[in-house]
Amino acid sequence: EKDEFINKYQCEQSQLLYTRYGINFSAYDYNALSVKPIGFDKEDFILSVGTDQHRDLELLDVIAKNNPDKQFVICSGNPEHHKRNFSRDNVTIIRASYNEMVYLYHACKFVVIPLKFNFHASGITTLLEAAAARKAVLLNYTPGLEDYGQHDNTCLFASLGDIESFDRNLNKLWDSEKLRNRLAENAYKYLHSDFNTYKYSQIYIELSKNILGI
């Protein structure tokens, strides 16, 4: 994004100010109120959150096809629209409230974020929420995500559109509780102190003051 602003929009380096996004980590930790979705009966499932234009649902469909022994739960704001994209018995698409999302994060085995190319680091909210719930994450790398994740330390990255890499890393996570726990704990420690709403708003206020000259 920095290169885009400098090269495309002819901004000076000194004109670019930067902050990291943050969430309320306590909203998804072990003490947060969770509610099991009505009729939900899945166990040992892989959770995917979001079905916007930057989610690679085609990749996720292939991954589900390649892993018929695993259950995938996809949370969508418009589940009926996206159900036609998935016809497999091991894929469940639901809409979930905040408290139901807390339940799903805590109950899932780990989280996957299949991404298409984008510049605004799509998926970071899900990445942070999973870290707050202490769940391991597998996602496709896009520019900017290196600020929020470190491969094989706080998460696992797969290249964009790389089905083989995504599938291989997914099965690594599935097979190794030790790996899942290590990534989840490292992600929590790395993200919760600097990527929270308090720190984000604090920096945003300072940036706003600099921009406005006050």
Per-segment meaning from a language model:
Residues S165, K172, L179-D194, Y200-E206, ...:
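A short, well-ordered alpha-helix in the C-terminal region of glycosyltransferases
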Residues P114-L115, L139-Y141, Q150-H151, A158-S159:
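Conserved acidic donor-binding loop of glycosyltransferase catalytic domains
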Residues A27, I38-S87, I93-N99:
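Conserved catalytic-core segment of nucleotide-activated headgroup transferases in glycan assembly
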Residues H106-H120, K135-A136:
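Acidic donor-binding loop of glycosyltransferase active sites
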Residues Y98-C108, A132, E146, Q150:
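Short acidic alpha-helix that forms the nucleotide-activated donor recognition element
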